Amino acid sequence: MHMSKSFLIISMGFVAVSVQAQTLTRDNGAPVGDNQNSITAGEHGSVLLQDVHLIQKLQRFARERIPERVVHARGTGAHGEFVASGDFSDLTLSAPFTSKGKITPVFVRFSTVIHSKGSPETLRDPRGFATKFYTEQGNWDLVGNNLPVFFIRDSIKFPDMVHSLKPSPVTNLQDPNRFFDFFSHEPGSTHMLTWVYTNLGTPASYRTMDGFGVHAYKWINQKGDVNYVKFHWKSLQGIESLRPDEVVKVQGQDFNHLTNDLYTQINAGNHPKWDLYVQVLTPEQLSKLDYNGLDATKVWLDVPEKKVGTMTLNKVPDNFFLETEQSAFAPSNLIPGIEPSEDRLLQGRLFAYADTQLYRLGANLFQLPINRPLVEVNSHNQEGASNSAQTASDINYQPSRKLELKEDPQFKAVQTQLVGSVQQKAISNPRNFYQAGVLYRSLNEQDKQDLITNLXGBLNKVTDKEIKATMVSHFYRADKDYGTRLARATNTDLKQVAKLAAM
């Protein structure tokens, strides 16, 4: 390789390629004369404030970081496409599902949930599975996880739950004493805890895990008919997770194993695929379930699934910060034909996720290329920091006789019949333990053993015997064999566990 002032000459066999080097500039476009030495007052004098290039470099360096996501901080993304497997316009007027073979561009961000940016990807955690569909009706975000349920059912407990799972404000260490103290007061968490302490809580690859929308949503068709749906991404690569002994081994070799695997496989042309399935219930069918079908701690048991399309991820981001880090997902990013259900956790997420993105990225986050819709945006939202919109009109209000910008009545929210009165109380028929037992009994013996090993490992770090016994009693109520084996693994008195379970 030979380098001159203006050119790089690269010889490869019989091929020579000349690349003219671009001139280094400051942010205002002015060329830089010396990027190696500061301007000083003489050879041994102080650095001068007039060295605007130096000052700008230091200023920009100090401002490179934006606020970390409060949850889902560690993540990786990929571009791809979703192809509809049929015409489902009888169920929804949402663009991705209205014609067979319809192609919709997507961007997916996988993530851990609790742990910070830069933390090992081997840590036990649910995994975020967020998909942004760029449709001709606007952007739709399906913001889910790799597990089908969640720890809580009401968003009023979300900050408390996250605080308990995050590091202690005293030691800055995650502490099972703290989060099991919280969960001992939340029996509805039993189902999700069972899921996350299986080996699914430590996936071997983002490619080899499923994804779930977790919540129920409403699908609305052109006639205004309403059905409730749940979404399920099924990995066509199969399901592969790390067993307890494998977690330690992998972490010692590569604590970025999920990101490395996804990037390596996509760049090698091994593009991962997921089929998207939906479960569909009419409002009447939903009301007849023997549990609350709008409870985020529940799955819809024995409700058939319908395949609606396939997603392929085929390109890694050109720049991590510009695309993956600045991508902003929120369940409130909906399009015609999809509306939120009355799920209490989802209702809170509609606000919280959109609000945290405004905090991270500012009011004009939708102008960032990764978040920008394919369709033209016509709104009177204006100004704010870092606004690059092209606005010349004098009319920034609606309605106006001077500007034809009007709403379209066909996209009004669907009418929902209400019953009862304003109230503040827990849901009826919570059935906190039943589905955790169903899950436990569905596991093979090896998976049961790994579940007990994983769960007991953290419970054995709990120093308060009452908290530990209460937690074991929750799992005992889900399934006696489950609780008995866990009591044995944690040296917890089984008689005390049975007594607590009977209360």
Swiss-Prot record:
Signal peptide: 1-21
Stored InterPro entries: Catalase, Catalase_AS, Catalase_clade1/3, Catalase_core, Catalase_haem_BS, Catalase_immune_responsive, Catalase_sf
UniProt keyword annotations, A-Z: Heme, Hydrogen peroxide, Iron, Metal-binding, Oxidoreductase, Periplasm, Peroxidase, Signal
Pfam families: Catalase (PF00199), Catalase-rel (PF06628)
Residue ranges crossing the lipid bilayer per the database entry: none
Active-site residues, record numbering mapped to chain: H72, N145
Reaction(s) catalysed (UniProt annotation): 2 H2O2 = O2 + 2 H2O
Location within or outside the cell: Periplasm
Major subcellular location class: periplasm
Source superkingdom: Bacteria
Molecular function in Gene Ontology: catalase activity; heme binding; metal ion binding
Keyword presence, Oxidoreductase: yes
GO cellular component, one term: cytoplasm
Gene Ontology BP terms: hydrogen peroxide catabolic process; response to hydrogen peroxide
Annotated residues for binding of heme: Y353
Lipid metabolism found in the keyword field: no
Cofactor: heme
PANTHER family: CATALASE, CATALASE-2
UniProt family annotation: Belongs to the catalase family.
Primary role: Decomposes hydrogen peroxide into water and oxygen; serves to protect cells from the toxic effects of hydrogen peroxide.
Name under which the protein is recorded: Catalase
